[in-house]
Each structure stands twice: as C-alpha cells, then as structure tokens.
Amino acid sequence: MLSPRRTKYRKQHRGRLKGTATRGNRICFGRFALQALEPSWITSRQIEAGRRAMTRYARRGGKLWIRIFPDKSITMRPAETRMGSGKGAPEYWVAVVKPGRILYEMSGVSETVARSAMKIASYKMPIKTQFLVASKDSITV
C-alpha cells in the first residue's frame, strides 16, 4: 500500500474539503481516466483495491497510472480511552480528493475494457466518479 517514506511532521490537522480541484484535473498520461465528482478522503487501501481490480480486469495489456498519493496521516485513539492525554497515534494514510481530481489513468486497452475496469474500480471508491476519454489535443507529455 502507498504511504510516504518520511514526513516533516507525524500528525496533521484534519482540514476542510472546500472547492474543486485546481491541479490534477486533466488527463496527462493515459487515454482514459476516472475522475472524482465528490470531495472525500481516499485511503491507501481503497487506492490499492482499485488498482488491483483494474489490473486484474485488464490482464496483460494496458498501462495504469495512479494520480493520487496518500500523504495525510489520520490518527486514532485506542478504544475506551478517557478524554485528554493528547492526540492519538497515526493509524493510516489518506489522499485528500476534491471534485474534478483524476484518480486513475489508463492506456493500451480498448475503450470497452477501460470503461469496464474503471467501473469495477469505482465500486471500491467511497465517492461518485465518472469515466473520461482524452481528446487528441488534450494529452500533454
């Protein structure tokens, strides 16, 4: 599963999910993409589950790009702990996703295969998503 090798600080504030994605909202690498339509935290386990589902469906063909990275640590307190005594220990990692963000990109497969693979991956996500096809002029390298 994805997680940072090291970070400057172990614990972060929760923050807010206001607005739409201004970066990472265009198809850059592949021909097909899965785009988020809602704001959410996506855990490293969910990202990995989506990746596995897509690679299994596409079999040998195709290349897959994961466009999000879980760089925010989420802390949790042990169960039945009294209030106070500081913030809990980092438990898992999430990627902060806003509407419009591209989650995955794919190329080297037909549109029907890509659409089906992305649909399976979308079931693993906690948000609504949409399937995108890059136009000829939109791909930048």
Swiss-Prot record:
Annotated spans, Disordered: 1-20
Has keyword Acyltransferase? no
Q: Name one matching Pfam family.
A: Ribosomal_L16
A biological process (GO) of this protein is: mitochondrial translation
Could you cite one Gene Ontology molecular function of this protein? Answer: structural constituent of ribosome
Task: Please tell me where this protein is predominantly located.
Answer: plastid
Basic residues bias spans: 1-17
Domain of life of the organism in this record? Eukaryota
Q: Name one GO cellular component term.
A: chloroplast
Cite the PROSITE patterns for this sequence. Answer: RIBOSOMAL_L16_1, RIBOSOMAL_L16_2
Q: Which NCBIfam families match?
A: rplP_bact (TIGR01164)
Under the heading HAMAP family, the entry gives: Ribosomal_uL16 (MF_01342)
* Protein's recorded name: Large ribosomal subunit protein uL16c
Q: List the top taxonomic levels of the source.
A: Eukaryota, Viridiplantae, Streptophyta, Zygnematophyceae, Zygnematophycidae
